[in-house]
Amino acid sequence: MMKYTKLTAVASMVLLYGCAAPSNIKPTNQLADQTILEHSQNLRDSQLTPAVWPAQDWWVVLNDRQLENLIDLALKNSPDMQLANASLKNASAMVMAADAQFDPSVSADASLSRARLSRSQDYSFQGHRYGTIYNLGLSGSYSFDLWGGERDAWEGAVNNQRAAQVDHQAARITLSTAIVQSYVQLANAYALQDLAQKDLDRTNRIVDITSRLLKHGLTSEDRLYTAQSGAAAAKQTLKKRELAVSQLKNAIATLVGQGPDLASTIHRPSAHIDTELALPRELPANLLAHRPDIVAAKWRVEASSKEIDSAKTRFYPNVNLSATAGFKAMLGDAVFGEPSQAWSVQPAISLPLFTTGLKANLIEKTAGYDSAVAQYNKTLVNALGEVSDNILAMQSIEMQLDDAHQSMNLADKSYHITEKRYEAGMGSQLEVLMAEQQLIQAESSFTLLKNQQQEQQVLLVRSLGGGFYQAPEAKQAATSSSTH
């Protein structure tokens, strides 16, 4: 009785020691306070026109069928989307693998073995005997998830799958906004090309007029050289503008996932972007639900939290049940007979005693959680900075456009006054062409600023999530607090 009591005490101590997960291994990083968005002075004080959040297919409002077709083609064929699809499939497979841990393992076995017995193996010590053994049966095992470790691992895999689903939508948003941005640049490149052609025509007329004046001895030869130099420079500028158009077409074709053949079919854009600065009334309170990168980062924090829970259960005892049933016989015609029936049931309990490997695994999962939290905090702060930068940039461009528009109007008035003076015989055609140069330069500056404003509008759409929105029930799950 005394020995039994001692053995029980020792076994209990070993059991308690083995079940103790290290309490000093725990995360150090904490999730950033989400109210940082609500307290943003820059966003709260912005003078903006209230609007709705971008729709999922927000580019449709641009009324450019060619652009819509390019984006549709890109979403189907782009390597970026193919990578996102592959990542999503991989995450789904991990969920399937984790889900399989809840099911019992069952396998069918069938074997036939023939052997020659040695004299020492033969009970009659004759040797030279042959035997054939037939084996047919089922075997299975089931591990009881007493501590919820498999459940935690499954939930972690599901959260990673949700993050991959959001990443898939983020890839869609990134690709579509990149195409629209390049498309806007292409539209403005065509406008600058038109102005370059207009300037080349102007300089050619100056060369023609100067040549005629020189022929009649009304000007000097250096004036002709100056005019020809201006024409050559204008021609060079036009070639640069034409190159920019071709390069942007190639860039769009690359984003779509096609080659140069597609670039040659892209026509001049007809899209018009509303450049009025407008943001939703709910900004920044609802920004978390509209930014896919923030949502995906939060799902990964939740996944890492569950992985820690699962790692802790590895320190506890594990109960496993194994069973086999089937037939074993030495005669083929007696395999399915009652004497050949065989079965076994084997319950087992296992307890880790040397836990260095388990501690290393827990440290790894804890470090993964800290990394996921740091990434979430970084994403949250970057989102705030991105929206703020876009607002500041658009407000600055808006003020610059006022000045550029005024400059263009004044240059236009000067041009028309000079033109009327020439028509009245009070000025020369060269004066008209010089005034036209000022107008073209002002128009070019205005076009460049307009391009920046339109690009910034596209970037603003992307910073607002590009049409992404997390459902309320998913948002509630993603924002659940971790208890590590």
Model-derived regions: residue spans:
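Sec/SRP-type N-terminal targeting helices
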Residues: 83, 99, 144-172, 222, ...
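Terminal intrinsically disordered/low-complexity segments used for targeting and assembly
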Residues: 2-76, 158, 242-289, 331, ...
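A short glycine-centered flexible hinge/capping loop motif at secondary-structure junctions
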Residues: 214-218, 422-426, 463-465
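Small/polar, glycine/serine/threonine/aspartate-rich low-complexity segments that form flexible
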Residues: 53-62, 72, 111-139, 262-280, ...
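Periplasmic alpha-helical coiled-coil/stalk elements that build and connect Gram-negative outer-membrane
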Residues: 159, 166-283, 393, 397, ...
